[in-house]
Amino acid sequence: NGGANAKASTDGSAVGYRVGQQRLVNETPKRDLDTEKVSYVAQSSNPFSLHSVVPADQAVYTKKALERIGDVDQFLVDELGYNDKDDMYKALASEQADSVALAIHQAKQGKAFIIGDMTGIGKGRQAAAMIRFAYKQGNIPVFITAKKDLFSDIYRDLKSIGNSELRPFIWAADDKVHSADMTDKDGNIVFKRTSDKEQKRVMEYLVKNGKLPEEYDYIVTTYDSFNSGTIEYENGNKKARKDGKGSKNGQLKRDVLEHIALNANVIMDESHKAGGQGGGSAYLQYVVPKLNAVTFLSATYAKRPDNMPIYALRTSMNQAGMESSELIDAIKRGGATLQEIMSQALASSGQFIRRERDMTGVTIDWKAIDDPEVVAEQREQYDSIIGLFNDIINFQRTYVSAYVDRRNEELAEVQSSIGIMRGTEALGIKNQPFASKTYNMVQQVLLSLKAREAAKSGIEHLKNGEKIVIALNNTNESQTGQFGIGEEIDAPDLGVSLKKGLEGTLRYTSKNAKDESESGYIN
C-alpha cells in the first residue's frame, strides 16, 4: 500500500495506516427516509480511514464542498509543505485530511470553518494541522483552548504531524494546581510555561512589531485570558468602563490580540467556550472579524443559542443580516429544527463538517440493581436527600425571596432594584433543566447511589484479569479542582454540594439607576 504499517492513536488520529485496511471509494450511500447517519466517504485517497459516519442530511453537501477543492491530497501537500502524499498520509487520516482541506480553503477566502467532529475523529490533530498551515504561510498561529492541560495535547498532536520543533509562546498565568507546562506522552516537560517577565516582554514586542519574536513560532493560551479588561465591547464597538474597574493585565492581552489580528490565524478549540454573554465572549466577537483567519473546533459548537453569533461573523450565517440578539432569539424559537437547517446550510457552504465513530455492532448491557436490601437502602438515601433539597427550596422561598422583595421596596425610591441571581432562585428549578443546580445535584445523587455497585463490578473484572474503563457523566471538577495532584483528602460526600447549594440561595445581584450591576451575599 506504499506506506509504513501503523495504527490509530488514542485521539482517533492516524499514524500511517494498517496493511490491507482500504477506504471504500464509492458514492455517498443511499439512505432511507428514516436513516439518521450514513458512512462517511472521504475525498482524500489516504487508505487509512477512521470508518466514521456523517449525518445523512449533510453527506451530499459535504461531498460537493470537497469536490470543489478537487485533489484534496495534493492540495494539502502544497499548503502544508509535506514532501508528497505518502508523507501527508502519515500525519492525517482520510477524514482529517478532508476537514483540514476545507478549513484551509475557507481561510484562503477569508471565511471561518467549524469542525464539529465527535470524540474519536481527532480534532486535536486537525487543530495542529491548522497551526502548521498558519506557520507555513508566515502568519501567527494562535491556539486558544479551555484549559491549560490541553497545551500538552496540542504539542503531542503537533509532534504526530511532524512539527514537534515548533516553539510555543505559552501565554498563561502561573498555577500550581493546573500546570501550563507542555509535556510529552510520558509526562516529561518539553516546554515550560513562559515566565511572567518574558510574557510581558513578548506582549510589548507583539504590540510594537505585529509579529512574534524569532524565538517563538506560535501562541497557546486559554479563553479566560480575555475575560476581564478595562474596556467593554458590544456590537463591534468598544468603550472604556465608566467605573474604571477591570483587569489592566487582561486588557493588555486583549490589546495584544487586536494588534496582531491582521497577521493572526486563530484556532479556537472547544469553541463553545468562546460564545455567550460574558465580557470575554463579547471581546472575542469584537476581534474575530479582524483576524486573518479563524477555525472553530467543538463537538458541541451549538451548545446554546448564545454560542451562535460568534460563528455568524465569518460564515454564511452573516448573510441573514441579523444582530446577535435577533439571531439568538430566532434560534430559541426555531429550536433543534432550525439548528439542523443551519448545519445543513453551513455544510453546503463548505464551512462545517461533523463526523463520529460508527457504533454499529456495539452492544450495551444494562445492569439493573435488583438486590432487595440494596434497593431499599438506596430508596431511603434518595428520599432523605430529596427532602433536604426541598428544605433548601422552601428556605429560599420563605426567607430569601421575602428579603429581596422588602429590599426592592426600599430601593425603589432611588430607582435601583435587587434580584436573585440566575441559577439560585428555587435552587435553579426555574432555569433550563440542564443548567440548573437541581439537575446537576440529582445526577450526583444517582452517581453516589450507583458508585459502590459499579466498583464491585469493576473489582470482579480485575480479578478475572481484565482491564476496565469506568466512564463518568460528570467529573465534578468544580468540587475537586482545588485539590493538588496526590493530595490526600477526606472521602467526599453530598453534604459539600448541598452546602454550596444552600450558600447559593443567599447570592444576589443589584442594579442601580445607571444600569450598573454588583453581586454579593445576603448577610
Label each residue range with its predicted role.
Residues 89-111, 446, 450:
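N-terminal pre-P-loop "Q-motif" helix
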Residues 112-118, 142, 469-471:
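Short hydrophobic/aromatic beta-strand immediately N-terminal to the Walker A/P-loop
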